[in-house]
Amino acid sequence: MDLLIKGATIITLDGENEVLKGDILIENGKISEISQSIELSKEKMFATKVINAENLIALPGFINAHTHCGQTILRSYADDLPLYEWLFEKIFPAEEKLTKEIVYYSSLLGIAEMLKCGTTMFFDMYFHEDMTAKAALETGIKAVLSRGLQTDERQQQRLDETKELIYNYSSDKIKVFFGPHSVYTCSYELLEKVAELSEEFNTGIMIHLSESEDEVNQCYEKYDMSPVKLCQKAGLFTRPCIAAHCVYVDDEDIEILAENGVTAVYNPTSNLKLGNGFAPVFNLIKSGVNVAIGTDSAASNNNLNILEEIHIAALLEKGMYRLPEILKAQEVLKMATVNAAMAADIHNTGRLKKGFSADIVLIKANDLNMLPCYNTISNIVYSSNPSNVYATIVDGEILYMDGRLLTIDEEALIKEIKSIEKILEESIE
């Protein structure tokens, strides 16, 4: 069924006149018209669902540009630890216990949370990624997926699984990238291989990059260069590349990222929680680097609340540089929409524009924490939270509305998650 969103305050993020009052007509999953008033014929009205949006804000659906959806099941399992101890002593061993079925339900849990936050697309790196793909297709959310790659006895198996993902799941809803985990878990030879394969399969790459001081120091000890320079040397930046974190990057690194069109994904909460410091986002943007926003996983955040991430992202840079005028609200909002779509080389989402996919979030404008409203974009960035999300729409399909998930049985999911929790409590330390 087609949709007509009537009387909304519309944030288009599409150049001039980015905030307007009007209607959005959605036909066959695409935005067919945005104007002050759209009148439908009687015949057309019967085939169109009308949403009264007089007290709603319509804006592009949020894109979570870095997470590990299958890891949601490890929320609160390993907290208050530095990155390497958290990863190698707790997370990696626990992940050995995660079956395909567990990753499927974990992915459903993560997707349910993201839909309630207004997320319409997420970028993901994990294992059993076919299960995350299955969950995404069943629920209607869009995704850019990568099977995490490492150098060990299963290296070739992981590469083969990536190829299978590309063959089996590439579609309008799902893109598949190659996903070398990091320079400290992948050999240089594997990084080179990934660059070759991504060229062969005409796809992109996502990687954790310069997340911690330990990573950078180890890279210098082993290769006598920074992680950024190593990735450039290996050829990763010849392909569309999404680099999560980029916390410890110097001016030369930033110049390399900018010159090669690499997207840096800002994950402020995860960086703070793991004690990894503050990404120089202002310097990255000033130098011409495309910057998006991600939550990272629920095991390191500990939520997938993109609205919270947008809020923290806007505030941290102002405090770090002691410059309240930097990273204005509109710029941060674009990081979670326009910039993220650009990162994955997707050109039909991230804005509300005629011909674009109808990936839309509706926010309640009359909730107490959203009043008064002198600046709509500022209220989204600095005031909103998931309780304000009225509807999440992907390709014109309503996936979440007025407190209800429409493509997920929430009660059944909760039952499954609690059952898995009991199993994992007995099998992981």
Swiss-Prot record:
Transcription regulation as a keyword? no
Q: EC number(s) in its UniProt entry?
A: 3.5.4.28, 3.5.4.31
Q: How is the cofactor bound?
A: Binds 1 zinc ion per subunit.
Keyword annotations for this protein, in alphabetical order, are: Hydrolase, Metal-binding, Zinc
Which of this chain's residues are annotated to bind Zn(2+)? 66, 68, 208, 296
Positions that bind substrate: 95, 147, 158, 181, 211, 296
- Stored Gene3D superfamilies: Metal-dependent hydrolases (3.20.20.140), Urease, subunit C, domain 1 (2.30.40.10)
What superkingdom does the record give? Bacteria
What biological function has been recorded for the protein in this entry? Catalyzes the deamination of 5-methylthioadenosine and S-adenosyl-L-homocysteine into 5-methylthioinosine and S-inosyl-L-homocysteine, respectively. Is also able to deaminate adenosine.
The UniProt entry's sequence similarity note says:
Belongs to the metallo-dependent hydrolases superfamily. MTA/SAH deaminase family.
Query: What protein am I looking at?
Result: 5-methylthioadenosine/S-adenosylhomocysteine deaminase
Q: Which organism is it from?
A: Caldicellulosiruptor saccharolyticus (strain ATCC 43494 / DSM 8903 / Tp8T 6331)
